[in-house]
Each structure stands twice: as structure tokens, then as C-alpha cells.
Amino acid sequence: PQINHFQNNRPVADFYCPDCSNEYELKSKNGALGHKVMDGAYDTMIKRITGHENPDFFFMSYSRKQLCVTDFLFIPKHFFVPGIIEKRKPLADTARRAGWVGCNIRIDQIPEQGRIYIIAGGKIKESAEIIQKVNRSNALMVQDIHARGWLLDVLKCVNRLDGDVFSLADVYAFEGLLGQKHPQNHHVRPKIRQQLQLLRDKGFIDFLGHGMYRKTAA
């Protein structure tokens, strides 16, 4: 199977799969991919994410000098939440589109489970490894945007912990950070426990008992 290119000037996506009709958008840049990638209008991007109109994304970096692709990254749509979209400053009054507000996609704010490299450092990854990571990432698919945000934020906290075995208290240490990200929720610790249970049910952590957990192999 292969993906096909949409006709020009389509506002949402660049490619589609003729078998399953899934859509993909490509963002590319010369040089290192970096932590963020420029996108279009901020309000449009937020509307797409919250309205479940976002395609899956490919991010590509290339070397114009060496005429080669250096990195090619796949990020499924269900890893997109408003928190990873960074609002840029409005264009100056002297600009042709004065006041227009663009955005950046903060790919460094996406959990590692959602950043799937097809090419890394100029080397193509094994297809079996890519398929395994995509299938595993699909377990994190959550339609409700608020529930998705909580699950991915707690997953990022777990990812930040050193080692494979950790305690509930270790995750509670992120209570302040999670409270800032979700100010409408005043019961952060119960929410943390709920997300850990979901991550266990989805196969990303094991519960060892007595408030202890273990990260599962990727």
C-alpha cells in the first residue's frame, strides 16, 4: 500500500491512504527538526484538534546541501492536544497580514510513545519496529480531548521518572505541574491514580502492589 497526494490547495491534509481514507499532513524543513515546527493559524489549529479534524502528521528534516532526508517522524493525530500548540506573536501592523496569529507545534511536548521515527539520523528504521510502535501507540487513542490531555500528561510524568520501577508518591511529585495544566480540576491526586490505572489497562505500566509500578518494555 502507498499514500496518495491530494490535489493542491487542500486546507487540511497533504496525503491520504486509498485503502482506509486516513489523512496525513507533512511539515518539512531544511536543517535540524528541533523542538518545534511552525504551522498555520493558531485558532484554526486549535479548532482542528478540539473538533477531531486533525490528520496524522509527518515531520521531515532534510539537508539541502547533501540532498538527503535526515529525519522523518510520524505522530498520530491522537497525540495532539491544545497544550502542544504554541501561540506566536501577532504579525506587526506593518505586515501584509497585520494581526495574524500563527502557531508552533511543540513536538518536544508529545510523549515519546507518540514520536515514531521512520528515518532517524539519516538511517531508515526497520519496518517491523515502526509497525510495532504504531500499533502500541494506538492503545493511547482517546477521543475526548480533556481525557486525552490528562492521560498524555500523566504519561509524560511517568516517562520523566528515572528507572523502570516507580512509586505512586513519585508521580504525586508532579501534582503541582498537573494542577497548573488542568486548573479546572481540584482533585489532582485521584485523577493521577485514575490515569495510572488506565496506563496499566493499556499495557504501558504494571502494578506491583503497595503503591509501586513498573514501566513495560516499549
Residue ranges and their predicted role:
Residues 190-218:
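Charged low-complexity interaction tracts in eukaryotic proteins
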Residues 145-165, 197:
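Positively charged, polyanion-binding regions of nucleic-acid-associated proteins
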Residues 10-24:
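Cysteine-rich micro-motifs
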